[in-house]
């Protein structure tokens, strides 16, 4: 049977090319909201972190109705670090809308998600978005998309994919580049005409592939997936199996069944093959599991998610300020929370270490792990993390390391400094082109060469540069790299930082703290331009004497301290440092707090 009343599509694109904004307009124009309903911008980015950063982290489902056809739309993350979300979501759909910015053109993540969609042989609709940008290069971008498709070995049919020209913010679409649209009708029509209806078998035994997981305090874990065949009913007895665990079958019951209407989950009594459904009642259900009829247990093969490339150590906070600011501080709390994250995030890995206090957490990139750290911090957790490390592989006795494909867009005058930095970081230029008045440079660079480069890059390009990277492949180890050219200013006394102590310390470098900040021995309070660390006493008070020289007691002027975000702190960390994370503060500290013990450890290292 062919389901003409249904289409399942995913929207894929590079970060910030306007996916979530376009979905907003599709919801508005299809009558999902009441006329008098107040709806915030980027309504799909419901998580607080997503709204703050303007990025999508979790793939989300919604649906619209157009000419009697229900279109299920899945908004996916555009950042490479959340690629695991994109890979598994593509299993739920039959076609994809590939969004490309009319000025920026295809970017690294565009290539990655497109490759995954082509591998699954999905139908493609190319959407050139933001055509109303003053710097739009519509004709060139069309050529770049075609080149990319050829590069990815697309079939003739995929090369002939329709192109729609949109402005997500204005809510207009047109099939012609030189003709302005009035609304999104051309886009909806293209979806109905080009994305094929599903061929389904409603009478066959039930089979649902779980592609996403949600959690609710009232009903527990909620599985989300597409019904591959058959019909699902609320309170139905089912079996759960997995393609990778042959012979392990669990029995259970679909207690609640929901369908997605607009942004809401609506309870449903039944759903048929092709529908994307949410269900609760199956404890321990996981991504990649297959829910099927008890009399026909058959697992659906699940897409292999790309391996993590970066790891960090999360450990219990053992600084002198431990337990003062956090709600959850013990190793039991930390372990429970990290393993709970695995239930939702397929591209994360957590391993126990030799001690009960520390855990190895691996992810797809620095941003992937920093989002987890920030989320835990907001939930009231207190812990400390090590510097990010890349995951090496040994192939035939030779060490291999992850290589990233880095694309930078910089003003012409900034290229010299970028080339110099890339040379120092073992980057290799593979492509260079002019894009308007700017230069686009493409490098292959070891992943560890990018650690700490973001802030340096923004300084080099006076804040005008844009850099994006994505995992390329594993290659033989490229040799040693220096992590940082600067040293740290380290407090050698515990207490409260005072103006007099900070005034004397600021001659040695740039400070991170204000007067009145509580510090402890071994805490990093600033950055030194020299390569070695310098111990400073920021708690030193000016002692009273009975002699005063005229004019010598002028008010001391302190420079503004450098305030660092979580990502900047992680970039700054050296191998002998840790970042203490609490709901209130971020403090960088030395692994060994005592200055004498630190000096002895350094001497031992030099000898070795």
Predicted regions and their residues:
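Structural and coupling elements of P-loop NTPases
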Residues: 1-608
